[in-house]
Curated annotation (Swiss-Prot):
Family the UniProt entry places it in: Belongs to the NDK family.
One example of a Gene Ontology biological process annotation: UTP biosynthetic process
Keyword list, A-Z: ATP-binding, Cytoplasm, Kinase, Magnesium, Metal-binding, Nucleotide metabolism, Nucleotide-binding, Phosphoprotein, Transferase
Catalysed reaction equations from the record: a 2'-deoxyribonucleoside 5'-diphosphate + ATP = a 2'-deoxyribonucleoside 5'-triphosphate + ADP; a ribonucleoside 5'-diphosphate + ATP = a ribonucleoside 5'-triphosphate + ADP
The organism's place on the tree of life at top rank: Bacteria
Statement: the UniProt record of this protein carries the keyword ATP-binding: yes
Subcellular location: Cytoplasm
Protein name in UniProt: Nucleoside diphosphate kinase
Any one GO cellular component localisation term in the record: cytoplasm
Gene3D superfamilies, A to Z: Nucleoside diphosphate kinase-like domain (3.30.70.141)
Any Pfam family the entry gives: NDK
Length: 141
């Protein structure tokens, strides 16, 4: 089983879409391994998105991600990373395929509801940013 990390971003929480998005994720065959609601500071958001620090949108991204609560989750499924990227759709909801999470729920490229890891290696690193080893342990249920 492969794992990936997702974050339901502050716009998702603000629009009260947590349940609808999780329902779509679970119906696509993903199992939620770990989940929490948290609020990132500008510093922690900056650390998480440090890979984008030289990009023009970095400041806005950090500000947005620290603007309210978010919900990071570790998900599990065969081919989790690629399948989840397909499920969430393109970064810009206007370009996202019909029926994808961003197509259904996102308003803009900047506030696009959800983050998904782009590789298995990054998924592991990103999961470690939010969850301890104990929190991410496999639970049979």
């Amino acid at each position: 089983m492969e794992r990936t990390l997702t974050i339901l971003k502050p716009d998702c929480v603000r629009k009260q879409l947590i349940g609808a998005v999780i329902d779509k994720i679970e119906r696509a065959g993903f199992r939620v391994v770990a989940m929490k609601k948290t609020k990132l500071t500008a510093q922690t958001a900056g650390e998480f998105y440090a890979v984008h620090s030289q990009r023009p949108f970095y400041g806005e991204l950090v500000e947005f991600m620290s603007s309210g609560p978010c919900v990071p989750m570790i998900l599990e499924k065969e081919n989790a990373v690629a399948d989840f990227r397909t499920l969430i759709g393109a970064t810009d909801p206007a370009e996202a395929a019909e029926g994808t999470i961003r197509n259904l729920f996102a308003d803009s490229k900047g506030e696009n509801i959800i983050h998904g890891s782009d590789s298995a290696e990054n998924a592991q690193i990103e999961a470690g940013f939010f969850f301890s080893t104990e929190e991410a342990v496999r639970v049979n249920n």
